A protein has these predicted regions:
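C-terminal catalytic lobe of FAD-dependent flavoproteins
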Residues: 83-155
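Active-site substrate-recognition segment that forms the wall
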Residues: 1-109
């Protein structure tokens, strides 16, 4: 976002995160689990599990530290056997106050933003997408907690 001329004033911070895809045939869960990390059912005994936080290493490479952290988190929640299918790393936009930014640009209202969901995106994205859609289509007010107008644009 720092190179985006319209939204570069927003306090988005790049954060590296690592996650696993695991296979756990004995884990019978059909909802997202959240215990300081998420476990998202994908179907066919596959689950996406994550994520880690790293503000210094902004590469797309997986790390042994990330792997160890994820294994520790999984083992604190799951009592069944599992197999690691995939280990990935990526960069996600986060906001210092950990609240996503949604809304219309203050000077160019035809530009909309839906960003900064961070790791909680997996949990909040469905509700926030409906909320934003209602705002765009029905002119319903945005929740102040997520409205990008909470960030003052510097002149």
């Amino acid at each position: 976002m720092e190179n985006n001329p319209y939204f570069k004033y927003l306090p988005l911070v790049p954060t590296k995160g690592e996650l696993f895809t695991i296979k756990a045939p004995d884990l019978e869960v059909d909802k997202i689990l959240n215990k300081g990390f998420f476990c998202l059912p994908l179907g066919n005994a596959l689950f996406r599990v994550g994520a880690t936080y790293n503000w210094k290493d902004l590469t797309y490479e997986t790390t042994e530290n990330g792997k160890s952290e994820l294994l520790e988190k999984i083992d604190s929640l799951l009592t069944c056997d599992y197999e690691i299918i995939d280990h990935k790393a990526g960069i996600r936009p986060t906001v210092r106050d950990r609240r996503p930014l949604i809304g219309l640009h203050p000077d160019f209202p035809s530009l909309a933003l839906f960003n900064g969901l961070g790791t909680k995106g997996v949990l909040i994205a469905p509700w926030l997408a409906n909320h934003f859609s209602d705002f765009l289509e029905n002119k319903s007010p945005l929740d102040k907690e997520y409205d990008l107008r909470r960030v003052k644009k510097r002149k």
